[in-house]
Design a protein with these regions (language model features):
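Conserved SAM/AdoMet-binding glycine-rich loop
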Residues: 2-99, 104, 180
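Residue-level marker for beta-strand->alpha-helix junctions and adjacent short loops that shape enzyme
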Residues: 13, 45, 73, 111-113, ...
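Alpha-helix N-cap and loop-to-helix initiation/capping positions
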Residues: 16, 20, 53, 81-89, ...
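Active-site mouth loops of central-metabolism enzymes
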Residues: 41-48, 113-120, 202
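Short, well-ordered secondary-structure micro-motifs
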Residues: 50-51, 79-81, 116-118, 150-152, ...
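Conserved C-terminal portion of the radical SAM core fold
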Residues: 65, 88-150, 165-189
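Short glycine/proline- and charge-enriched loop/turn segments
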Residues: 152-159
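Radical SAM enzyme core and accessory elements
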Residues: 193-202
């Protein structure tokens, strides 16, 4: 089979025992001789549960990239969305992945404070954590309420007002202005975004 890329499903494969992941990677590369990349989502807490040696072992075994849902660099926002970690813990998780040689793709979400929140603090804190984390890739998505979630219920009840497209674009502009990672591949071409962007920074 001419398989060159494999994505380990689903939401957070890093949470598996390192021994299991190493066995999976070994079998993947044995089964697919042309395999070049194995990628996965990585949760901050599960990443922090791995020692630096474990993360390096995963990289050496062929785990090439990890997607980390940073969402925000603001502790207030992370608490509001029940992310389950602090900004400092998120930063450490990202830095550990980078230090292990794993290609880090960070993901942030615009509009998480709504119309009445401190959106500038959210954006500037997010730019700050990304600048310290130094991922090679960054994607900005836009908050979209989901039915059955606490924030989705707040939207339906009128307690949370979703940002307008103009406000989201203003957030994206401010984020781009304050990013200082060289080089950085930036995208905002997810279906949730109002303006698709893709390019290299600086």
């Amino acid at each position: 089979p001419n398989v060159e890329r494999v994505f380990l499903m689903d939401g957070d494969a890093i949470v598996m025992r390192t021994e299991q992941l190493l066995q999976i990677l070994e079998k993947l590369y044995a089964a697919f001789p042309k395999l070049q990349k194995v990628t996965t989502y990585a949760g901050p807490r599960s990443t922090l549960s791995k020692t630096p040696e474990e993360l390096r072992a995963l990289r050496e075994a062929g785990l090439t990239r990890a997607y980390l849902g940073v969402e925000s660099g603001s502790d207030a926002v992370l608490q509001a969305i029940q992310k389950g970690c602090t900004a400092a813990e998120m930063l450490q998780a990202g830095q550990n992945l980078v230090a292990a040689g794993i290609d880090l793709w960070a993901i942030v979400i615009l509009g998480l404070t709504g119309q009445g929140g401190d959106w500038e603090e959210h954006v500037l804190s997010t730019a700050g954590i990304i600048n310290k984390m130094k991922p090679r890739h960054l994607s900005a998505m836009t908050f979209a309420p989901a039915a059955g979630t606490p924030l989705g219920e707040d939207v339906l009840a009128g307690r949370f007002q979703v940002c307008t497209p103009d406000q989201i674009l203003e957030e994206c502009h401010l984020l781009l202005e304050h990013l200082d990672v060289d080089p950085l591949h930036f995208t905002s071409n997810h279906a949730s975004n109002y303006l698709p962007l893709k390019g290299g920074l600086p």
